[in-house]
Amino acid sequence: MMKAILATLAIFGCIWPGQSVMFHLTPNTQKCLKEDIQANQMVMGEYEVSDVPGQVIDFIVRDTKGHILSQKEHITKAKFSFMSEVYDSYEICFISKVPPHQRGIAQQVALTTKKGVETKNYEGIGEASKLKPLEVDLKRLEDLSDSIVRDFVMMRKREEEMRDTNEKTNSRVLFFSIFSMCCLLGLATWQVLYLRRYFKAKKLIE
């Protein structure tokens, strides 16, 4: 039983690992990494940038409305954390700044992020609550299961919202198409009647 539980935990750990990325930031440019995060979810991370004399990199985290959740200038190596208040797309940005008189070179940036269950210290929780190792693993599994359920519920909700939006868009397109056809038919009828009156006035037709 214990082996089965630990195997399940290992599978979940492979599906939801901490995200690590490494890239080179071109001088006087900005690179942002975006991710959709659920409401009331803790996000923790750590970054490190290569040191280049005379060049600096600023760090900022913000949501789609421009609210700043974390910010630091002239970064080298540090940790950060923030709590998402609402479901939104959050972006982590690194901004390179190089003086005009200096020829800049690309700097290496390493970033590691964790969110939700990944941010919890289960060893500390187990020690504080005097839990056995198996009970700690069960607690981790329970939290992972809850996280999976919330993710699927959110995905289902977004799918329904997108379907409703598509249905509304299709209805509007159909209405606009019918309206356009009616306008074209009306214009064609008006042109025929106008030309008929014109030709009659010129006595070209009876």
Swiss-Prot record:
Q: Which GO terms describe its biological process?
A: dorsal/ventral pattern formation; endoplasmic reticulum to Golgi vesicle-mediated transport
Q: Name one GO molecular function term.
A: cargo receptor activity
Q: Which residues lie on this side of the membrane: Cytoplasmic?
A: 194-206
What main location does UniProt list? membrane
**Keywords carried by this UniProt record:** Developmental protein, Membrane, Signal, Transmembrane, Transmembrane helix
**Using the chain's own numbering, where are the disulfide bonds?**
none
Query: Listed GO cellular component terms?
Result: cytoplasm; membrane
Topology relative to the lipid bilayer, per the entry, is: Single-pass type I membrane protein
Provide the leader sequence positions. 1-20
TM regions (residue ranges): 173-193
PROSITE patterns in UniProt: GOLD (PS50866)
- Name the source's superkingdom: Eukaryota
Subcellular location, record wording: Membrane
Extract the Pfam families matched here.
EMP24_GP25L
Give the GOLD domain ranges: 30-140
Q: Which residues lie on this side of the membrane: Lumenal?
A: 21-172
User: In which family does this protein belong, per the annotation?
Assistant: Belongs to the EMP24/GP25L family.
Task of the protein? Eca and bai are essential, though not redundant, for dorsoventral patterning of the embryo. Specifically required during early embryogenesis for the activity of maternal tkv, while the zygotic tkv is not affected.
Q: What PANTHER family is this protein classified in?
A: TRANSMEMBRANE EMP24 DOMAIN-CONTAINING PROTEIN (PTHR22811)
What is this protein identified as? Transmembrane emp24 domain-containing protein bai
**UniProt source species:** Drosophila willistoni (Fruit fly)
Gene for this protein? bai
